[in-house]
Regions:
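Conserved ABC transporter NBD signature motif
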Residues: 56-68
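Helix-to-loop junction immediately C-terminal to a conserved catalytic motif
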Residues: 48
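The feature captures the beta-strand-to-loop junction immediately N-terminal to the Walker
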Residues: 33-35
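ABC-family P-loop ATPase nucleotide-binding domains
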Residues: 78-130
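C-terminal coupling/interaction segments
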Residues: 229, 233-274
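Conserved structural motif at the start of ABC-family nucleotide-binding domains
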Residues: 2, 17-19
């Protein structure tokens, strides 16, 4: 679907990416994560064409190559689209630009967004739903979602994610998330990419990743095991092992615990706030 080749990008003199490479698979949900400032949102903006790389290229397959932005939806972390317009005016403008005859506003009705409201009067959650509604009207093949969804209330977040699941099921839409809170989306993610220092530190299918990272609770250090990260307490310690193998269970003096995605990512970044 998307191929990033030898990409470099700087903010002023600060280098964010240098000779960066990535393949995004069609029909998959990819999660991009890492500590704040590592370049997650920048990477989405580069894919979306909002930012331009200093060198390298971003290639799209034949279904998108002629006009990538026509087949792509980008929900950024600001959602400031059409703020000065009424909902109805923004819809009309969007329909004229994209030559849309029939506009489905059922999501707007479900979330109490009125056509006579100004965009600036909508809550953050309503703006996200409105933006998603505009995107859906163009029948996107690729959807890029920044971390804005965790700024909206539980109900609207649920509406958003249910619609996303429908899209993936019915339309085989490719989705790329940038995310700091994984509990809402963990069950729909196929692949996890963790960025560190402008490089890919981890790139795993989610089930493979969960099988490879385990927590060992023990009062003695596990011998000759690859400890990724540890947390010390008064009477015991938690050891995060990667890559974990089943045979290691015979070598540990303590319990082996399965981890959710939040705990796994925290282990990789050494417990830093993400």
């Amino acid at each position: 679907m998307v191929t990033i080749k030898n990409l470099s990008f700087n903010y002023g003199k600060a280098g964010i990416f240098s000779d960066f490479n990535l393949e995004i698979e069609e029909g998959k949900v990819t999660l991009i994560t890492g500590i704040n400032g590592v370049g997650k949102s920048t990477l989405l903006r580069l894919i979306a064409g909002v930012l331009k790389p200093a060198k390298g290229e971003i290639l799209f397959d034949e279904t998108m190559a002629a006009d990538p932005r026509r087949h792509m939806g980008f929900i950024s972390d600001t959602v400031s689209l059409y703020e000065s317009l009424k909902v109805s005016q923004a819809i009309d403008f969007h329909k004229s630009v994209y030559k849309i005859a029939d506009f489905d506003d059922s999501l707007l009705k479900r979330t109490k967004v009125r056509h006579d409201q100004k965009i600036r009067e909508l809550s953050v959650g309503q703006r996200v739903i409105f933006h998603l509604t505009l995107i859906l009207s163009t029948h996107p093949l690729l959807l890029l979602i920044d971390e804005i969804i965790h700024s909206i209330d539980v109900y609207l977040r649920g509406v958003f994610l249910k619609e996303l699941i429908r899209l993936m099921s019915e339309k085989n839409v490719t989705v790329v998330f940038v995310n700091l809170n994984f509990r809402d989306i963990e069950n729909i993610v196929d692949r996890v990419i963790l960025l560190k220092d402008g490089k890919i530190a981890v790139d795993e299918e989610i089930n493979a990743l969960k099988s490879k990272v385990k927590k060992v609770l023990s009062d003695t250090p596990p011998q000759a095991l690859p400890v990724l990260f540890q947390v010390d307490y008064a009477d015991h310690a938690e050891y995060y092992i990667y890559p974990f193998k089943e045979e290691y269970k015979k070598k540990v003096n303590g319990d082996v615990v399965d981890l959710d995605l939040t705990a796994i990512v925290n282990a990789f970044i050494g417990g830093e706030y993400i």
